Amino acid sequence: MKHPVDTSQWGEFLLNDIATLTNGNKFDKNKMSHDKPSINFVSRTGFNNGISDFVDKIDGTEPYPAGAITLALGGSVGSTFVQPKPFYTGQKVGVIEFDNKSEKMKQFVAVVLNKVCSTQFSAFKNEINKHFKRDLSIPLPLKSSADLSNYDSTDIDWDYMETVMS
């Protein structure tokens, strides 16, 4: 490992306080057309970056942008990926969008989120979809100047995440 991860100065953040969260398109893959496929279709699978098909662009429906993070809310619960290309989603796929964050920063968040989800949530018991937009929190590194007893999202150390993932 190039950069050992120091977790001594981390804080807990509600995901909906630091990113824009949506429940995806909720499209039915079996009803998608495949005449001129040009858009990735992300479902609840934990394989292939969550991409389970390649479908036609839908008139009037813009795909989510490349760089958005997808989170399986069912199926392979908690599978988290940064999407490399524009995409649509199936049912029970959350989409997380950050403003002005690098690919590496988003990859860091995706790894942390995947770990949190794999330890705290499961299908049919404590389902993540009940928490996704309401109270899902993740630990993130804080700047060295942050007060551990009183911090906010401006104290998140995004540069540290970039360094660790480089």
Regions found by a protein language model. Give the residues of each.
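Non-catalytic DNA-recognition/assembly elements of restriction-modification systems
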Residues: 1-26, 33-49, 145-166
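DNA target-recognition domains and sequence-specific DNA-contacting regions of bacterial/archaeal
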Residues: 17-138
